[in-house]
Amino acid sequence: MVWLPRVPCVAAVILLLTVLSPPVALVRNSRPRFLEYSTSECHFYNGTQRVRFLERYIYNREEYVRFDSDVGEYRAVTELGRPDAEYWNSQPEILEDARATVDTYCRHNYEIFDNFLVPRRVEPTVTVYPTKTQPLEHHNLLVCSVSDFYPGNIEVRWFRNGKEEKTGIVSTGLVRNGDWTFQTLVMLETVPQSGEVYTCQVEHPSLTDPVTVEWKAQSTSAQNKMLSGVGGFVLGLLFLGAGLFIYFRNQKGQSGLQPTGLLS
C-alpha cells in the first residue's frame, strides 16, 4: 500500500506524479483503475477543550484502516488494512507522531484560524412560502427557507397559531453554498385552515433574538380582495405620477414664453 504523508504539499506532489504516470495518462487505457487516498479530520468540542483526530485510508471508496486519537493506535476496518495497522503500530516513531497530531496538527491549525473562523457571524435570510397555490383545506407544504448564514449550527421551528408543531416536519439539512455560508429548507406538511397563522422561528449565533416570519392562511376571495386593493393602489400611483408629470411640463412651457412688445 502507498502511504501518503499528512504534509499537503508533499501529498499533492505524490498524487500529481501518480496521475501523470504513463499507464494512467493514456486516454484509451482500458485497464481497471484503482484509487487510494487518505483524509485527516480534526473534531473540536467546546473549542480546543477536547480534540479528536481521525486519519482514514480509503481504497476504491472503502475505508480499510484508520487512526483514532481516542483509541491511540491504528485499527483495521477491513482485512485489507490489517497488515498496515499491525506494521504501523509496531513502529514507535510512526505511532508517536500520530498521537501527537492532536496538538501539532489540530490545535495548531485551530489557533491559526481562530481569529477568522470562530468569531465570524453571518445573519440568515428567512423567507416563508407555500409550495402550492391552491384553495385552503387541501394538503400543502409550507417552506421556511433559511439562507446565507454562518456558522452552520442553527435551529428552525414551526408554530401554528402560537403552538409549536412537532410532526410533519421535513428538512434538507445543511447545504454548503461554497462561500463559507450555509442554507437549509425546513418544510411543514399541513392542511391550512382559513385564519390560521403559521410562524417559522429561526435561532442562530449571529442573532441576539430569534427571527420570526409569518404566513397567514387566507381564502381565495380574501386573496383576490387583497390583490385588487394592491392593484388599485398601484394604478392610482401611476395616474398620480402621470398627472404630476403633465402639470410640471405645462408649467415649464409657460415660464419659457417671452412677453412680446412693439418694435420702435
UniProtKB/Swiss-Prot annotation:
The processes (GO biological process) annotated in the record are: adaptive immune response; antigen processing and presentation of exogenous peptide antigen via MHC class II
Q: InterPro entries from the xrefs?
A: Ig-like_dom (IPR007110), Ig-like_dom_sf (IPR036179), Ig-like_fold (IPR013783), Ig/MHC_CS (IPR003006), Ig_C1-set (IPR003597), MHC/Immunoglobulin (IPR050160), MHC_I/II-like_Ag-recog (IPR011162), MHC_II_a/b_N (IPR014745)
Connecting peptide as annotated region, ranges: 216-225
Q: What membrane topology does the annotation report for this chain?
A: Single-pass type I membrane protein
Q: Which CDD domains match?
A: IgC1_MHC_II_beta_I-E
Q: Which residues lie on this side of the membrane: Cytoplasmic?
A: 249-264
Q: Record's SUPFAM superfamilies?
A: Immunoglobulin, MHC antigen-recognition domain
Which segment of the chain is annotated as a signal peptide?
Answer: 1-31
PROSITE patterns referenced in this protein's UniProt entry, alphabetically = IG_LIKE (PS50835), IG_MHC (PS00290)
Which cysteines pair up through disulfides? They are C42-C106, C144-C200
Where do the TM regions start and end? 226-248
Has UniProt tagged this entry with the keyword Transcription regulation? no
Q: Which GO terms describe its cellular component?
A: MHC class II protein complex
- Protein name, please? H-2 class II histocompatibility antigen, I-E beta chain
Name the gene: H2-Eb1
